[in-house]
Structure formats: C-alpha cells, structure tokens
Swiss-Prot record:
Keyword Disulfide bond tagged: no
Active-site residues, Swiss-Prot/TrEMBL: 25 (schiff-base intermediate with substrate), 58 (proton donor)
Cofactor: pyruvate
Name of the protein this chain belongs to: Aspartate 1-decarboxylase
Binding-site residues for substrate, renumbered to this chain: 57, 73-75
Gene3D superfamilies found in the cross-reference section: 2.40.40.20
GO biological process, one term: alanine biosynthetic process
Amino acid sequence: MRRTILKSKIHRITITGADLHYEGSLTLDEAIMEAANLVPFEKIEIYNVNNGHRFSTYVIPGQRYGGECILNGAAARLGHAGDIIIIVSWADLDEEELKNFKVNLVYMDEENNIKEHKVTTVFSEEVKEIAERNKNLVRD
C-alpha cells in the first residue's frame, strides 16, 4: 500500500507580490525552499488564509534571503501582497519508506524570516504525544 504524506510545510508566509504576466509558478526565497526541502519545479499546494483559495502550482527559486513569495501567472489572481498563505508538498510513499521519512515544517514570522524549523517523522514521540492527547476527543 502507498500513502500520501506531508513532505514540506511552510506555515504563514506572506505574499510579497503578484505578476499576472509571468508564465506561472510561485517565486520563493531560495533559502526558504531549502529549509522546506523543496526543489525547483516541484508541485506545491497553496492555501490562502485570507480568502480561502486553495490551488496548486510549482515553485521556482527567488533571491536568497530576500523573503520573496510572489504569485505568478494565473495564480496572481488568487492572492495579493500581504495575504498570509500556507505552502505544502506531498510525498507518495510505501510502508517501508514511511518508517524513516522526514517531514519538514517551516514556520515564518511577519517579515518572511524563518521563525522555527522542525524536522519530524510520522512516528516521532511528538506525534505520538499529540495522538495520545487527542484520543479522548473520539466519541464512542
């Protein structure tokens, strides 16, 4: 069996611009891409916290340490400078790959600086603790 698992998450990054006439994609600060384990032309999903739009595109590197997060092409219609977004990518893994797979979680501040960077696994102690805390939310 294969499972689709979160590979990378950039949480609450601010859109810095939009270029409707660029051919497509999201331009993202190269250092943020590396922290999140994203490579150029990788498929990503974008969730716009401000307006609820959810869409997919691909990522291309922007200026390193510039804080760039620019919607390009048709995606430019789905967000504006100042909007807060969440960027995710997924991995398709078999059961063996899942055992040691590392998830990159990158948390941003208001200036598009990395506030926190976590690398975790599906079976980490932290994830087990969250599951344990939430089990009493399940109703019989």
